[in-house]
Amino acid sequence: MASVNVDFEQAGELKIGQVGIANLRVRTLDVPRLVQEMRERVTRAPKLFGRAAVILDFGGLSQVPDLATAKALLDGLHEAGVLPVALAYGTSEIDLLSQQLGVPLLAKFRAQYESAAVSPPPPPPARAEPAPPAARPAPGRMQRTAVRSGQQLYAENCDLTVLSTVGAGAEVIADGSIHIYGTLRGRALAGAQGNPDARIFCRDFHAELVAIAGNYKVLDDVPMDLRGKAVQVWLEQDQIKIAALD
């Protein structure tokens, strides 16, 4: 079995994707610790994480786990209450591991590995051309009516403004920021394509979950004095921050 590294605060970093799939970026191959962390997440937020689809991302490890370790991790995550459905695309070793495990690779994660590869030499400088006019930003999306339980609303490449409520079990997602002028009882995911500068603004905060660029916080982690208040949510050093609006 591969060696264990216990220098991390968490063995696995869980981030929420825009289509309800979580990405578990494995930081250390400590299988019992990874499984226990996932079990605790499911216990704390069963409606959010119970039977959630999870992608395993081994890209941050110095070596790919062997087959026995990977199988033990998949079995343990199943027992913890989630459903490992794929591996994040990576090296040829991860490709082989996915075949041995009988799970697919998710091509969505291909770019993050390819960007780390050695870049080809730059082309010779060309004659300077006048810069084209800056493209106008995409107009924000506005939702005038309530977003009800089971509904999902996605604002692609723009901000999202909801003039009514977001009910429990509903999900609003934006590549930009999210502004909610009613009560937020469901989930709000801003910066869905990885924008860490996105924010969430809400007049009446009871969210099941808020996330920015995949980093999330559930209601149980929110101080009681912020519930029912007008708040803003932002990301600071990969940590979700929530504060009341003056």
UniProtKB/Swiss-Prot annotation:
InterPro entries: CAP/MinC_C (IPR016098), MinC (IPR013033), MinC_C_sf (IPR036145), MinC_N (IPR007874), Septum_form_inhib_MinC_C (IPR005526). Residues 116-140 are annotated as: Disordered. Keywords: Cell cycle, Cell division, Septation. One of its GO terms (biological process) is regulation of cell division. Pfam families: MinC_C, MinC_N. The keyword Chaperone does not apply. The keyword Cell cycle applies. Residues 119-136 have a biased composition (Pro residues). Interacts with MinD and FtsZ. Cell division inhibitor that blocks the formation of polar Z ring septums. Rapidly oscillates between the poles of the cell to destabilize FtsZ filaments that have formed before they mature into polar Z rings. Prevents FtsZ polymerization. Belongs to the MinC family. This is Probable septum site-determining protein MinC. It comes from Xanthomonas oryzae pv. oryzae (strain MAFF 311018). The gene is minC.
